[in-house]
Amino acid sequence: MPTSNTMKIKTKRPNLYLRVSKGHFATSNSHSNYYIDVATQKSRLSEAKAVADELCNYYRHNTIVDTILCLDGMEVVGTCLADRLTSGDYVNMNAHQTIYVVTPESVNSSQLLFRDNIVPMIQGKHVLVLAVSVATGRTVEAAVEAVKYYGGEVAGIASIFATSHECSGYTVNSVFDPNDLPDYKNYSSNDCPMCKKGEKIDALINCHGFSKL
């Protein structure tokens, strides 16, 4: 972890928790006082299943999901979520009893695209946007814009951690939120109080992880 000030936020599930470090962290467009490490939730099957089980409860009874659009390396969680939403023990809203799991290509920091062979999995489909976190919301906003551009309908937004319950006019459902991390702060990179106090940045962070400075 990027700092020694780390802790785990536990849930009722023994294999589902949030590992965080407190410090001064920078992304490409914001600064925060916590680094939230979700590497194991994204990569370890048992934890990805636990995340999927939690998120499934928001959509299994009343939401049609044809496609799960995975951002930030969430393909393992997305596959587990698709499996849960189409399993026999849940009431399934999907007419075809199956779900596409796709990822977009990034043109630049604010635009996403789908190749011609992927477009049919978006166009005319109910698309659930799945992200690691929703903090500034820029990546999710780009995903929502892309889904609409390619003729899809946004079915909802889901994430492991979110600081807001709404983004681009859609409800955000998450496993963890500020109630689990009440002193979490996210600032614009040019208006960061930690920078103004002269506090050094501990690490650069993005959806892939961290790099200590």
Where are these regions (language model features)?
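Active-site-facing substrate-recognition patch
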Residues: 1-64, 207-213
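PRPP-dependent phosphoribosyltransferase catalytic core
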Residues: 2-12, 144-213
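Short secondary-structure boundary/capping segments
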Residues: 16, 24, 118-120, 184
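Short, well-ordered alpha-helices that flank and scaffold nucleotide-derived cofactor binding pockets
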Residues: 57, 83, 87, 145, ...
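Short glycine-rich phosphate-binding loop at a beta-alpha junction
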Residues: 63-74
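A contiguous pocket-lining binding segment that forms or flanks enzyme active sites
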Residues: 113-159
